[in-house]
Amino acid sequence: MEKEGCRMLGLKKLRAERGLSQLKVAMDLSISREALSYYENGRRSPDLQMLLKLSGYFNVSIDYLITGREFRKA
């Protein structure tokens, strides 16, 4: 049985909003399209290095990548 990862709600949302294909993002980040799909759908969780790459690529926080929501300071 494959281990379940954390679903990256913001990642899929950002990619769709920007009109980017999984293949384009995967190629830009030097990963497989399948790996990106697994991250988006929670079949695999990215390590910290990949979270930082994704965060930099989309210019958003890691929190946003995971939740799809902006966090505001109180």
Give the label of every model feature segment.
Residues M1-G5, K13, E17, G56, ...:
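Short, charged recognition helix plus adjacent turn
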Residues R7, L11, S61-I62:
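Hydrophobic side chains within well-formed alpha-helices
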Residues L9-D28, K53:
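Short basic helix-loop element that most often maps to the first helix and adjoining turn
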Residues L11, V25-A26, L36-Y39, L65:
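Conserved hydrophobic/aromatic packing and binding residues within compact polymer-binding modules
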Residues S30, Q49-Y64:
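DNA major-groove recognition helix of helix-turn-helix/homeodomain DNA-binding modules
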Residues I31-S45:
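Recognition helix of helix-turn-helix/homeodomain-like DNA-binding domains
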Residues R43-K53, R72-K73:
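Short, basic-rich loop-to-helix N-cap that marks the start of a DNA-contacting helix
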